Amino acid sequence: VKVRVYSFWIAFRGAWRNIPAHMKRIIPFLAFLLMAAGVLAADTRCYELRIYSANEGKLEALNVRFRDHTCKLFEKHGLTNVGYWVPVDKTDSRLIYVISSPNRAAHAKSWKAFLNDPDWKKAYANSIKDGRLVGKIDSTFLNATDYSPTVKPVIPKDIRMFELRTVTTAPDRLKNLHARFRDHTCEIFENQGMTNVAYWTPMDEKKGKSNTLIYIISHMSKKQSGDRLEITKWNLDQA
């Protein structure tokens, strides 16, 4: 949205003096309409939530591999690094992250290119010389809901706690849950000092397309329930 509006103003900046007065009065209004249209546009990107369960003692090495190699290679092949987290509970050796791409077909193409990249193959081989880093991988493809904030990488000004929450509804009740979040819950979260980060539903039925809401909120306090996560420090530096 910002790029579209910025380009609009750059196009007119050089010739501003030659624009009729009545046009000058409506240009800001047109710019507002462009911004409004962008805000209302649906987020059609493909998101992938990936959860890696690291083998015993291997989480730090896994973080190093992502920090030094994987994140850069993702971007090289068209995959956007959205966020990386580790659980607050230090006995939980999972790395949880979200990547995105324009659509699922593009996502699959980018992932294949990433796996076939010689730099990735070299980094992977070097990282497992003392044993494999990951014991289990869980992947869920996601669509953003119509009430989700714009999902984008950010550099938090303060250390925050994050909650990854999954809600499973009774049959045919997901639309009611969406209505409650859209009309009430998201606003109440913000009023209570929580930040709405992202809201998604799975793309695939086997992952809960018809009855599952997955969302992330953040807090300034650790005194919250749920699956609490810390954003990885190396992601703060690179986001």
Model-derived features with residue positions:
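Short S/T/G/P-rich N-terminal loop/turn motif that feeds into the first structured element of a domain
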Residues: 40-238
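Short secondary-structure capping/junction motifs at helix and strand boundaries
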Residues: 24-25, 121
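Short, positively charged and aromatic/hydrophobic N-terminal segments
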Residues: 2, 17-19
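Short, low-complexity, charge-dense intrinsically disordered segments
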Residues: 1-7
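Sec-dependent N-terminal signal peptides
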Residues: 26-36
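Serine/threonine-rich, low-complexity intrinsically disordered segments
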Residues: 12, 21, 28-29
